[in-house]
Amino acid sequence: MFNKVISILGTLILLVLAGCRDVAPISVEEPSTENRTITLNLDITTRADNGTDTPEKLRLWICDGSDNLIQYIENSPTWQASSTKGVDWITSLQAKIKTKEIESLNFYLVLNDAYSSVDDTSPISFNINDIAALKNTSFVLTNYGGDNKVPMTGTQNLTLEANKLEYDVSIDATRCVAKLGIYCTKSNSESKLTIKSITLGNIPDKGYLFETHVDNQINYTAETLSFKGEIKKIYTDAFPNNFEDFEKIEETSFTQVYYDYLQENLNGDGDIQIVDNEIADNKRYYIKLEYTLNGLDDEKIIYLSQMKRNLLSKIYIRINDATTINTYCQINSWTEHEMEVPAFE
């Protein structure tokens, strides 16, 4: 059986605000019967982008259906602003590959560098021929310059047809990390509320570029956050029940005490749980809040729901008196509102 040549023309990478979208194939010259032209449209979802924040490095593995490497592409693409609604940036690349008796292709995309240790000065160096190792690659959190500088990955499969020479392939690359914001307020303008300490607990020491694994080698640590001091902002009304209304009062009625990237942690269900003491063997993220209200000391531990990759979670905390608090959890993707969780008391 003769070799078939597949020509990959014009990988179009789209930085979007609202997930995948359909893009018409780029018009190309009609290929010969021994060529296949594949157009790759890679959708990269983002939220909270400042308009200039673009991924810095692209790595793309093109494999057969058994994950044998056909071609590897690595570059630092030049991004161009897009006039298309819902699209921020566009870049393109070209490559040609030869195949023989291949029925399908697998694509693995990694954007930006990842590090295997916080002490590393060089990013992870991939064995480009070992796809199994690629899919099991773990990484640690480092300092990122923006939402689109974090590690992002995407996969796709393409079934080849006997007489088809041109394909559209859309790869949705998503961030491999979560993001968490914590906000505090009080319910009485006459009260004096001071945060003594905030601890974020059960932080996984590593995450995975692709699928999250059940990994007994993950260690969970706790970190004391930098914020401490008086909370002067007040919110006395009932908590809103939607994201838009919360955003309207967030800046005026709540003090932001934390806002940063986190590793994915799939322990936990859909509920927030408020307790006075840590729960043994519970590996959910938790917030330990130590505070003084009108001279009385207290502390609460708030166990969070699952912290999934590419999701932005906001925890709103209102301290009513020395022993009772209200909480509200808002979970959204960086691209659109995915889920609203009602207030838990």
Segments predicted by a language model, with ranges:
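Bacterial N-terminal signal peptides that target proteins for export
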Residues: 1-9
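C-terminal motif of bacterial Sec signal peptides marking the signal peptidase cleavage site
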Residues: 16-19
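Short, polar/proline-rich extracytoplasmic segments that appear immediately after membrane translocation
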Residues: 24-31, 304-345
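A short, Gly/Thr-enriched small/hydrophobic beta-strand-prone motif that recurs across taxa
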Residues: 24-46, 173-187
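Tryptophan-paired
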Residues: 49-126, 183, 187-311, 335, ...
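Structured interaction patches on ligand/partner-binding surfaces of diverse proteins
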Residues: 80, 115-167, 295-320
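Short strand-edge motifs at loop-to-beta-strand transitions and within beta-strands
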Residues: 91-93, 167-171
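Interdomain boundary/hinge segments at the C-termini of tandem beta-sandwich modules
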Residues: 160-162, 172-175
